[in-house]
Amino acid sequence: MKVILKENLENLGHIGDIVKVAPGYARNYLLPRGYATEATEKNAKALEHAKRQLEYKRNKVLEQAKGLAAKIEGLTIAITHQAGEEGKLFGAVTNMELAEHLKAQGVEIDRKKIVLAEPIKHVGEYTASVKVHPEVAAALKVVITKAD
């Protein structure tokens, strides 16, 4: 019996795959649990339509993410912090502080998406990576200066 998978199943295949299985396995396990539907012409057409819609939405989200990444790449965050004699900061600049500065410039990003190689503890120029989308990352320029 041929079925169209609705879920990723480890030993069978991925979503949308048409696989041949034993009739009992399909009738007693896959179909009742909603893991698959029977591979009829109608179901195959519905699957193709759903795939096209999903691909369209995915492309639209990806384009928005690329636009946001381009906006972030053009920004430079300037932060003034208390620092000691040799430029060592009292405390550290974290991704939470960077997220607040981005929000002030009109870009709202979750702090967990801002990745610093290590906490910023000295005056200088740094680059932070912002994961806008699983496939899109932007480099954010951060300039730390000493407060008077």
Curated annotation (Swiss-Prot):
Q: Which domain of life is it from?
A: Bacteria
PROSITE patterns named in the record: RIBOSOMAL_L9
Quote the Pfam families the UniProt record gives: Ribosomal_L9_C, Ribosomal_L9_N
The entry's cellular-component GO terms read:
ribonucleoprotein complex; ribosome
Question: Which terms are listed as keywords in the entry?
Answer: Ribonucleoprotein, Ribosomal protein, RNA-binding, rRNA-binding
Provide a GO biological process annotation: translation
- Whether Ion transport counts among this entry's keywords is no
Q: Which residues cross the membrane?
A: none
* InterPro entries according to UniProt: Ribosomal_bL9, Ribosomal_bL9/RNase_H1_N, Ribosomal_bL9_bac/chp, Ribosomal_bL9_C, Ribosomal_bL9_C_sf, Ribosomal_bL9_N, Ribosomal_bL9_N_sf
Briefly state the protein's biological role.
Binds to the 23S rRNA.
Q: Which family does the record claim for this protein?
A: Belongs to the bacterial ribosomal protein bL9 family.
Please give the name of this protein: Large ribosomal subunit protein bL9
Tell me the name of the encoding gene: rplI
